[in-house]
């Protein structure tokens, strides 16, 4: 557990201080400080919740899962749970395919694509592909194969055959693939997409993406497919990976080319630069 906490600490330090050696103007520093305030709060809150869930994994997981269990997981066949389980990943795959299709058409028939879709360029596609295949697909399945954690309905506590294990504890359940949640991680690609769409609709898009992710995460718990820690760490780890990639590819580059020091920065220029962040 000490090793895991050290990893969270290193991630926090990197996310906060990776631009420390850049020479920034006063205007840029001010913008950076305003940008970092919510990031600092998020990292502090996420670290605190993570430590709590790691230390109290058994109590939190069994209590919440027990609320939806009564001689079986009675919401397992619920229409909402079944729809999220069956169609959620297909819908995201279709959306990813649509974005790839738009990018391909732009390369061939530029005049046919609306200017509103100009944000789908080579750099954006690279970011979305890294997020889709790396953080949202390879990462969760790597965790599943390594930890082999039993799903709630597979544990002996809930009429299964495998032993319950805490989060980040390697299990030996042959069919165990609970940690971390694949559906939840996959849904986090919507967050990656929301980060690169035009600024004017970015905030509502991020809000919608987070809402969809939380809805899918809730359905995984209600159906007895995952524990609370499975979906929480799926969101946290996948989200950190996506944000670190976005920060490296977009924010760090913008900060590396700020307005020159000593050059008067107009209100319009400041707003344009802030929009890039």
Regions found by a protein language model. Give the residues of each.
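Hydrophobic, aromatic-rich transmembrane alpha-helices
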Residues: 97-110, 187-196
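Membrane-embedded catalytic cores of phosphoryl/pyrophosphoryl-handling enzymes
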Residues: 37-47, 163-277
């Amino acid at each position: 557990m000490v090793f895991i906490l050290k990893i969270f600490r290193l991630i926090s330090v990197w996310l906060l201080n990776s631009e420390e050696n850049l020479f920034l103007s006063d205007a840029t520093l001010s913008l950076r400080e305003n940008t970092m305030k919510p990031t600092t709060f998020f990292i502090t809150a996420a670290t605190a919740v993570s430590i709590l869930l790691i230390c109290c994994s058994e109590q939190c997981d069994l209590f919440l899962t027990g609320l939806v269990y009564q001689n079986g997981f009675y919401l397992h066949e619920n229409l909402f749970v079944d729809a999220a389980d069956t169609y959620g990943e297909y819908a995201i795959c279709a959306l990813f395919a649509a974005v790839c299709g738009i990018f391909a058409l732009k390369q061939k028939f530029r005049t046919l694509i609306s200017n509103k879709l100009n944000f789908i360029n080579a750099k954006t596609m690279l970011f979305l592909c890294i997020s889709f295949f790396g953080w949202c697909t390879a990462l969760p399945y790597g965790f599943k194969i390594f930890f082999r954690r039993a799903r709630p309905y597979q544990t002996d506590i809930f009429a299964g055959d495998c032993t319950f294990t805490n989060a980040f504890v390697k299990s030996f359940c042959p069919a165990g693939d609970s940690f971390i949640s694949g559906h939840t991680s996959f849904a986090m690609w919507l967050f990656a997409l929301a980060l690169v769409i035009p600024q004017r609709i970015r905030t509502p898009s991020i809000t919608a993406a987070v809402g969809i992710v939380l809805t899918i995460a809730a359905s995984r718990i209600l159906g007895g497919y995952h524990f609370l820690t499975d979906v929480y760490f799926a969101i946290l780890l996948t989200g950190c990976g996506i944000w670190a990639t976005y920060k490296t590819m977009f924010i760090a580059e913008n900060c590396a080319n700020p307005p020159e020091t000593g050059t008067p920065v107009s209100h319009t220029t400041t707003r344009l630069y802030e929009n890039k962040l």
